[in-house]
Amino acid sequence: MDKKEYSETFYHPYKPYDIQVQLMETVYRVLSEGKKIAILESPTGTGKTLSLICATMTWLRMNKADIFTRMETNIKTNEDDSENLSDDEPDWVIDTYRKSVLQEKVDLLNDYEKHLNEINTTSCKQLKTMCDLDKEHGRYKSVDPLRKKRKGARHLDVSLEEQDFIPRPYESDSENNDTSKSTRGGRISDKDYKLSELNSQIITLLDKIDGKVSRDPNNGDRFDVTNQNPVKIYYASRTYSQLGQFTSQLRLPSFPSSFRDKVPNEKVKYLPLASKKQLCINPKVMKWKTLEAINDACADLRHSKEGCMFYQNTNEWRHCPDTLALRDMIFSEIQDIEDLVPLGKSLGICPYYASREALPIAEVVTLPYQYLLSESTRSSLQINLENSIVIIDEAHNLIETINSIYSSQISLEDLKNCHKGIVTYFNKFKSRLNPGNRVNLLKLNSLLMTLIQFIVKNFKKIGQEIDPNDMFTGSNIDTLNIHKLLRYIKVSKIAYKIDTYNQALKEEESSKNENPIKETHKKSVSSQPLLFKVSQFLYCLTNLTSEGQFFFEKNYSIKYMLLEPSKPFESILNQAKCVVLAGGTMEPMSEFLSNLLPEVPSKDITTLSCNHVIPKENLQTYITNQPELEFTFEKRMSPSLVNNHLFQFFVDLSKAVPKKGGIVAFFPSYQYLAHVIQCWKQNDRFATLNNVRKIFYEAKDGDDILSGYSDSVAEGRGSLLLAIVGGKLSEGINFQDDLCRAVVMVGLPFPNIFSGELIVKRKHLAAKIMKSGGTEEEASRATKEFMENICMKAVNQSVGRAIRHANDYANIYLLDVRYNRPNFRKKLSRWVQDSINSEHTTHQVISSTRKFFSMRSLNSR
């Protein structure tokens, strides 16, 4: 297939909408023209994920086809390519290139595809038998000692015993403690991935055929070097649920082979990366509750004398039949994260480490934000982004996520509880701890007491900036000591032992008192292990940068916050061929340009804001110009505004929207919604409105109300859901069809300007403007723009919950006269802007609403 056909069809499994074609063409053009950044807004429900898959996979296969075609052409014409090769290349490499080894490469690729097809038609149990047979054909090398070890220890005691809580002996300041250092043999070095020109790509492909890359003589797998894909598509999203949705979408299209008829059935090599919490199959590790504890328990077990029966950090394990079988099963069809665990169990192979070994072969890799955005995590997982395509979905939260990854916070209460936990642990086990463990625990406890005293003595106001050197003034603690303590925490795995011991004590005490810990409390404790929080905070203390700042936050906390998210993001930009930032609500895009991409030339950035797939008549957005409806900080508590104008609007809207359809209203904060509810209840207005529509409202510590609201809507009784911007229901919930026929935004949800975080951010932004030669007026405008961007991003994210598919319909009501101002309207998503109705009074809005729904044939009850 030629390039024209590639770029026009994209192998979309259905007839694509115009905006899907527009998005696919934009992505393909960005990749073909070598642009660095694409910022794409495509509303939820418009098939964004599938469009991204089709465009990027089409380009990837086309790119590989181009390389293959040029290789064929060079070989057929016996073209001398030596001038494009390095002068120090040995003669045999050039001779090999000039001879027709290409056919051998093709044969190996074809053999591997046939091998994957055989696996795809075989059950997991049958595959294990097939692996035993395959070693006779030279594909795998049997490693009998590993098999015997795995078969010999199937029954495990997974209860928590006291021995589980005791660390191995630790020698203070000794380098011999670090059992985590190991070499990973049989891997290609980073330089082998740096393929910037066609000829370097050709050389690498040839190298992988005939041995320029060093091969392990114990490696019986003839496929692992042949099938590496240096150029990959990395797709990152916020949750594993979203990554699972990507997997289901990837199964829909079919893409042609990069090698046409020579390798006719080239499968998509898809690899879902996940954490040990999702993929671990060892009961001794799985019994721990938190990701941090699981990671430490895994490392502790792997480095113990007993070891893990599912994994060994050796080339022998990597090339044993079952490890290779699991790798190939991953690629035999498109597997979800949940599929990897039963596959690993059936073969007795760790799916977490086996999936990491499969990384070089993969074409498409999905991974959670943390894996992509943390440079240290990418390094530890050997994720090389060189010349690859990086797609970051749900990117509206990208800046906040980067800031969160590189920030840390610890409260006075956290420090006191951690101190108490260490004392409890130390008193219990001190006689069973070696001197190295005892000394370091005492040092750690002393450090905690120093931080406690610093907060008690120095906390004056939220947003007060802190010089980190002041925290330890007058103590014998310095940065070197903190480095040593961090190393102790990492090597000894003491954090999870102390945290889990104290949690076990709480559960035991609760059980004895016949007063079980509430499930919600247990979850909160296990999800925030205190000593892990402390170690993260200490890490920030030892890795100071000019882009971060320590300051006091509420609840007597010290927070370290990254102020320049563009700095850690630079490493991704520098390595990747292209970075695609995609989301349903990406406006205002100026936030990305100023905060994340300040050094990227505008010519290298492409932006696209798509309209919705629904017909224009399926959506109306109303803004009233009634001056009474202005929810500024000074006016929003007004009894007249709350009890008269706001209340009457909801009564009128509740009557205008058919009862079969639900109404979802978003309020700027829990505090304000609680104030409104209280006012309405004091004068029976709440009961009056509740008689028109059953009211469900979100409370900060309340129970889940979504199921009750959904049931009420399904029964057609008329339902009103009052939710919070940034709350549990404003993101990730699909209010499609009758769940939301009207979405109301009450006021403009500006963030709290008195929070320590915003005080420091605004001060930093103003200082940066002034330092670059700006005026005070320019600094003031920049901080105002910063606050507006936060506000409007929240608005777009909330109202985007309403329309979820092509046949859906709903109305949006922006209930504040300030939405009429150009600076706010221009920051609405394009599809919302294009649907704005010019009605002015609430009476006109309600009248137009009745007409809208009368045309939709909704049954009114």
From Swiss-Prot:
Cellular-component GO terms for this entry: nucleus
The protein's name in its UniProt record: ATP-dependent DNA helicase CHL1
Organism of origin: Saccharomyces cerevisiae (strain YJM789) (Baker's yeast)
UniProt EC number: 5.6.2.3
Region described as Disordered: spans on this chain: 161-188
First-tier enzyme category under EC: isomerase
Keyword presence, Magnesium: no
Function field: ATP-dependent DNA helicase important for chromosome transmission and normal cell cycle progression in G(2)/M. May have a role in changing DNA topology to allow the loading of proteins involved in maintaining sister chromatid cohesion in the vicinity of the centromeres. Has a specific role in chromosome segregation during meiosis II.
UniProt motif (DEAH box) ranges: 393-396
Reactions this protein catalyses: Couples ATP hydrolysis with the unwinding of duplex DNA at the replication fork by translocating in the 5'-3' direction. This creates two antiparallel DNA single strands (ssDNA). The leading ssDNA polymer is the template for DNA polymerase III holoenzyme which synthesizes a continuous strand; ATP + H2O = ADP + phosphate + H(+)
Pfam families registered for this protein in UniProt: DEAD_2, Helicase_C_2
